[in-house]
Amino acid sequence: MRWSFLTVLLWLVSLTGAENGFNGWLRYAPVQCDKRCQRALPSSIVTLNSTDSGPIGTASQELQAGLENIVGKQLSIKRSSCGSRSSILVATLEQYRQACNRSSEVPSLGIDGFWLRAYGDTVQIVGENERGALYGAFEYLSLLAQGNFSHVDYTTSAHAPVRWVNQWDNMDGSIERGYAGPSIFFEDGHIVEDLSRVKQYARLLASIRINGVIVNNVNANATLLTSQNMDGLARIANVFRPYGIQIGISLNFASPDTLGGLGTYDPLDPSVISWWANITDSLYDRVPDMAGYLVKASSEGQPGPDTYNRTLAEGANVFAKALQPHGGILMFRTFVYDHHINESIWTNDRANAQVDFFKELDGQFEDNVILQIKYGPIDFQVREPVSPLFANLYKTNMAIELQVTQEYLGQQDHLVYLSPLWKELLDFDLRVDHQPSLVRDIVSGQRFDRQLGGWAAVVNVGTNTTWLGSHLAMSNLYAYGRLAWSPTDDSQGILQDWIRLTFGRDQNVLDTITDMSMASWPAYENYTGNLGIQTLTDILYTHYGPNPASQDNNGWGQWTRADHDTIGMDRTVKNGTGNAGQYPAEIAQVYEDLDSTPDDLLLWFHHVPYTHRLHSGKTVIQHFYDAHYDGAETAHRFLSQWESLKGRIDQQRYNEVLSRLVYQAGHSLVWRDAINNFYWNMSGISDEKNRVGHHPWRVEAESMTLDGYEPYTVSPFETASNYKAVVTTSNSTTGTAQTKLQFPSGTYDLGVNYYDMYGGKSEWTVYVNDRVVGQWEGNSENTLGHTPSIYIDGHSATRITFRGVEIENGDQLKIVGVPDGVEPAPLDYVVLLPPDVVD
């Protein structure tokens, strides 16, 4: 589709308007380029034998709009011979060879690859296909947007053919594990009418070389397959197609029964086979280039072939065969496990499930099936070993499943740059058959000579202008695309490209955000879960705040087996679940032995006393205490680092990021204290540094003089400072808590830890004597993206801080809380800190 001049103009205006995150890394902010600089750049864009509606047409429009915004130069678009001077030539490899007679100078190109040669005013962008040419155009614009006008001449091709993103969007417009607003695809059971945001999403994805999008939740609703909704899918596909992106959909295994009325969904039943073939034909009639299907079956209550005693391979192949006439791919998730297993049986282990279910099926899947394997054996934890399934399938296509949306990792309200986590997994050598077997080479198909393979990431963008709910979280989407294309790229290098494109080329900005981001995963691991114990979040509720007790005493299998004396899963072959033995011999030997197991996976593979000494010399329990304090201190440092950038970043994005970092600093303390108090209480072993349970700068709310407030026993107990909070005596009673301050006179940062529950917007006012020093409203459901909580717990716990408060010894501190809805203006404690002290 050809963009009108007005459309291009409006788009350019949008780029120069408010910096709200909508443009992501495609801001194309102006860089310094005087008239001499402009004369040295191309004057036109030449396309060879292409239509306006394809990716090359899109490339020409992107180049035209991008160069005008970046360097202020207007380029015409024309179709002519390859000999045009002062031009950007955009073509496929075949077009270039036919039109230019220069076959000898063209390098070889692999999957979706491109050749970019730029010498001043002469630029050649040649793609292995139209998609590759579009990627080359985005690459050239990325260089210019970062101020790089140097001569370049290189080729690059995709690491793997499949580079998809998954959206867990529901038909009602909600998004499972989405933290950035409603779906851009669905509402009220149908496809939305306005797909303008989908177009911008397509631009962002194409610029990082994503070639497929699964648009709906893996916990799929069969109503997506109605005629009306299939027509809607065609509209979505029409938006993505000019950007070289194919759409696919998730399927509900039981659809032949629930939607088709067959009374069965047995994958070997002829009527079921016919039903899926007909549905697939109908979809391809509407979307001829549909990428294929994604299926979650026999997992977490989702229907599957086990209902009829059929194998998972038989279940997958019914879809694969329906897709084969159309060239479609089936992505079949290996996230299959029993969530009712008995913890009292020492050898039970959810981590064994993927190999147990799929190893014996190797070679039984159709050639267009790719098994989509989560990076670890459990579920997107802050640290897991690589899934052993990658080492157990020789004759089956594989893809790695990552998660851009931060389900267990702070839900975009905590800064966590994920590329270093992913790189550690991708670079891991599984040593299959004692041969080099890097995970990245397994999923590409290279290691086992498979033709299909690749990448999937659960992204879950929403209608929030930042796409993911947080400006800084977009670094993870950018990094995913870069790694899916070239997994040998450096995490810091990827990050710095993103920073320059997103925030500009100010060196202070670059250095500061680099330092913050590269420290963020270790910090989050430190204050949420160490030594391979998993993310100690509430696995039964929000997957957000701390609740280590929720890991155990249930059938979900994310156990820690912590008791008074010991902690950790014994996954050895000798004494435990045998999970270590699922790895190839060289790796199994490392994990089987307590001494050779890396400290950061110790509690994943071994059950040890709290007093066990790590390679560092610390005991397990002291490492827990120290790491949680270190992590929280790092989160507080992020705040001061960001504040140093004031005036260097536009005000809107500066303030929005600042708000999240203020919250993260406070919530990291909730995490720190909850985990430390939990294990101190369980083990009875004190912190050698006497920090845990000792907070001399705090005043507990329940110790204050209360009027209209009453003490409340918090559950989990560890999510309140002294295991208690105060709440108003009724939802219509204003509460007052006051105390005489016994601190030396001076200037303090006054913090209040409270609970911001879903279902109410309480108001609080803090007084020193009769002077108001702070007021706020509990409205985090409007300002933050994490899954809210209706309880007083570690999800709703938070802190607000008022800086530079003058205090005299003996001053009267008073907090007045006005409840609202179900929220009884809950308070935990007040803290008065000298500047730069973290309590």
Swiss-Prot record:
The EC number(s) this enzyme carries: 3.2.1.139
Class of enzymatic activity (EC top level): hydrolase
Keyword Ion transport listed: no
Localization, UniProt: Secreted
Primary location group: secreted
Keyword Glycoprotein found: yes
InterPro entries (UniProt xref): A-glucoronidase_C_sf, Glyco_hydro_67_aGlcAse, Glyco_hydro_67_aGlcAse_N, Glyco_hydro_67_C, Glyco_hydro_67_cat, Glycoside_hydrolase_SF, Hex-like_dom2
Pfam (any one): Glyco_hydro_67N
Protein name: Probable alpha-glucuronidase A
Domain of life: Eukaryota
Functional description taken from the UniProt entry: Alpha-glucuronidase involved in the hydrolysis of xylan, a major structural heterogeneous polysaccharide found in plant biomass representing the second most abundant polysaccharide in the biosphere, after cellulose. Releases 4-O-methylglucuronic acid from xylan.
PANTHER family: ALPHA-GLUCURONIDASE A
Reaction(s) the record says it catalyses: an alpha-D-glucuronoside + H2O = D-glucuronate + an alcohol
Family: Belongs to the glycosyl hydrolase 67 family.
One biological process term in Gene Ontology: xylan catabolic process
Glycosylated residues in this chain: N49, N101, N148, N221, N278, N309, N342, N464, N526, N575, N681, N731
Gene Ontology terms: cellular component: extracellular region
Signal peptide extent: 1-18
Keywords, ordered alphabetically: Carbohydrate metabolism, Glycoprotein, Glycosidase, Hydrolase, Polysaccharide degradation, Secreted, Signal, Xylan degradation
MF (Gene Ontology): alpha-glucuronidase activity
